[in-house]
Structures are given as C-alpha cells and as structure tokens.
Amino acid sequence: MSQLFVCTVEELPDGGARKVEYTPDIALFHYDGEFFAVDDRCSHGNASISEGYLEDNATVECPLHTASFCLRTGKALCLPATDPLKTYPVVVKDGNIYITVSEEQ
C-alpha cells in the first residue's frame, strides 16, 4: 500500500469534489469535515462520480442516471445501480490529503 498525495485541505472546501487521475480514476469528496474516496466511475454507467451531486448523510448522486451511493461504504443506495463503488482510505496529515492505494492497481 502507498499513499497518493492529492491536495491540501485548503484546496478542497467542504462540499467539494475532485477527480484524481489514477488507474482507475478516484473521486475525492469533502463532506462535513470528513474526506471520502471512491472509484470515479459509476458502477451502473460510464459517468464520473466526481461530477455528481453531494447529498446529505455523505451520499453522492450519479450525474447520469441518478443512482446514489454511500461515500462511507460505497454501497449503491438506489436503482439503477446495484453494485457498490470501491472505497479508498483517506489520510489527512499536516494539512495534506492522501489516498491509500494498492501498489498493484
């Protein structure tokens, strides 16, 4: 496992999202003081989750077909999506945000 530097806390305001170019791309969200990272591709269609709509209770709605996902677990919360999004651990250290990724990705 390795830590991928993304940005500083100041660069991602509360309610913000950022696409992290990686293989696969990762969506990073800042919700209510917490940071969450999930696969950036909707499990139902070819849409960028980082362009989705951040909602209450740390959920995000896909911009294409309105599928909704829990950012904490990646679980698909409503149709048309049924498969979860992969989640990634996020570490904040000295004001910097890192995503923990597998070196095998």
Curated annotation (Swiss-Prot):
The keyword Cytoplasm belongs to this UniProt entry's keyword annotation: no
Write out the pathway annotation from the protein's UniProt entry. Answer: Aromatic compound metabolism; 3-phenylpropanoate degradation
Task: Tell me its cofactors.
Answer: [2Fe-2S] cluster
Q: Which GO terms describe its molecular function?
A: 2 iron, 2 sulfur cluster binding; 3-phenylpropionate dioxygenase activity; metal ion binding
Q: Which residues form the Rieske domain?
A: 4-99
One Pfam family from the record: Rieske
**Cofactor: record remark:** Binds 1 [2Fe-2S] cluster per subunit.
Keyword annotations for this protein, in alphabetical order, are: 2Fe-2S, Aromatic hydrocarbons catabolism, Electron transport, Iron, Iron-sulfur, Metal-binding, Transport
| Function statement | Part of the multicomponent 3-phenylpropionate dioxygenase, that converts 3-phenylpropionic acid (PP) and cinnamic acid (CI) into 3-phenylpropionate-dihydrodiol (PP-dihydrodiol) and cinnamic acid-dihydrodiol (CI-dihydrodiol), respectively. This protein seems to be a 2Fe-2S ferredoxin.
The name this protein carries in UniProt is 3-phenylpropionate/cinnamic acid dioxygenase ferredoxin subunit
